[in-house]
Amino acid sequence: MEKAIVLVNLTPGSEEQSMSALRSTAGIKSVYQLYGLYDLLVMVEGADDQAVKSIIADSLRSRPGVVSTITMKVLS
């Protein structure tokens, strides 16, 4: 299994709706609301790098309310 941590910036007021939708998305293992520079921390897990990339591109970055993301691949 491949894993990634994604930091997400959202449009103001979209936090609850985004968290709820992401928590029910296949491949997204955890969603945490943050205070500070980023709004959410999202843990993504997939069978391989391509699966992780697809989850991030298709299910996370394309969501309404998502302004920007920073992705960090987990090595161990």
What feature does the model see in each segment?
Residues M1-S76:
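A compositional/biophysical signature of low hydrophobicity enriched in polar/charged and small residues
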